[in-house]
């Protein structure tokens, strides 16, 4: 098994605990960096951000691994916890890749549980067809924010949220993307 991690130096105690657990469970731990690519099953992936040491990052959220996946006529962009500044930086450093993602239906894993720290410009550029928001029910942070949900609605993006729909899985069936939520098929 392979674990891909950010090269950002983070000295918080919980990071050490997670790193130790990862060392016990993963056969290989690699630092993901912009330009790194590979395959996973039928999909191809590419790291769009950060750089190897993530020196451009202000904090661990800003150093989130951003990956683009291409599979069976669909694309997936995962933003981790990347905030608005990082999303703008991503647009500058990976603009051609982001434009390419629009050539097929795009699924977006929304950054940071749908916090308000989002780039309208990035979302307008990529115009995701489906947005996945991983967020706890009745969380104290107010995630996802109304501004994010309004932005996605304005872009015509279908939204799936773990706080409403439970566990979410996607699969391709007869060249269509099918979502299963909470154990039941939808979309």
Regions inferred by a protein language model and the residue ranges of each:
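Non-globular, low-confidence helical/coil segments that flank catalytic cores
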Residues: 1-187
